[in-house]
């Protein structure tokens, strides 16, 4: 797939723009849908899931790195404020949520071809980018605060829903039930509604988002620790 995309992209670069653009888009679209087609036609399709998770996680780390670069301006002497600290806490909450799911909860030995894992990371990447962009807009007095708040929460929603959607591939005792999904959705909806109501006050919006993401992470951590203690042997020196 990578080879096909490379060939078509280089071929597109050699052609006139009115032809090259079609070849380029064909290459992108073909390699986007090929994993689905291949796994449907090849019943013995196998994948090294731990290796795949490791590689995708590296891309997520890079995306979080871009978020850190976006936050760097908030930690200068001229711009440092309570927003800087709250944004950093939000980023940590999202980071812990992601790696709690994909580094600890997911079953790396289960029957998972990895296709859903791959495609579900597109909204994760898009969500993180949307959050990064929104951070500067929320504190910009010239920005439309209702739109900035909506865009910010759309990013969080994309990220969180994509992460939680992989819960069906977790270890058997760590698969989320309806109550877990409902509680996570409830936390998000409360945060969204309150933030939209106070969208004219950036500090309030950022504070609500901080508490919301923290509540989501605490809920996941409590679920993970309780289930692990009950059905598995914890390997935590702290306990």
Name each region found by the language model.
Residues 1-22, 29-196, 210-239:
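Predominantly late transmembrane helices and immediately cytosolic-facing juxtamembrane segments
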Residues 205-209:
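N-terminal signal-anchor/initial transmembrane insertion module
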